[in-house]
Amino acid sequence: MSSIIFSAKDIFEQEFGREVRGYSKVEVDEFLDDVIKDYETYAALVKSLRQEIADLKEELARKPQVSSAPSPSHPDPIDVAASSSMTNFDILKRLNRLEKEVFGKQILDNPDL
């Protein structure tokens, strides 16, 4: 990561040589004033974010470590019921499709069934 070359003070105190056909001094000064304001804003933002990072790291260090994997000895009853009903529903759909394949022609040929 490269280091910061200029501070807001460096930009403010920068002197430029004068030439006959140069830029407007007023426009350059106004532009540099805006650049200085941006630098000050970025510096404050970086300081704030570094403090936030430090606070979050401290908070993380204080919290007990929790396992991310659920305990297999205590499955959630809602999850078990949902997966069971989905499995039953899937089985019924497959059974229906197989019956149509196997008995479909017989049902179409014999309308009494």
Swiss-Prot record:
Q: Coiled-coil segments, which residues? A: 36-65
- The source's domain of life comes to Bacteria
**According to its record, what are the GO cellular component terms?**
cytoplasm
**Broad class of where this protein is predominantly found:** cytoplasm
- Subcellular location, in the record's words? Cytoplasm
Carries keyword Cytoplasm?
A: yes
Pfam families named among the record's database cross-references: DivIVA
Subunit structure as annotated in this protein's UniProt entry: Forms polymers through the coiled coil domains. Interacts with PBP1, MreC and EzrA.
Q: Per its database record, what is this protein's job?
A: Divisome component that associates with the complex late in its assembly, after the Z-ring is formed, and is dependent on DivIC and PBP2B for its recruitment to the divisome. Together with EzrA, is a key component of the system that regulates PBP1 localization during cell cycle progression. Its main role could be the removal of PBP1 from the cell pole after pole maturation is completed. Also contributes to the recruitment of PBP1 to the division complex. Not essential for septum formation.
Q: What is this protein called?
A: Cell cycle protein GpsB
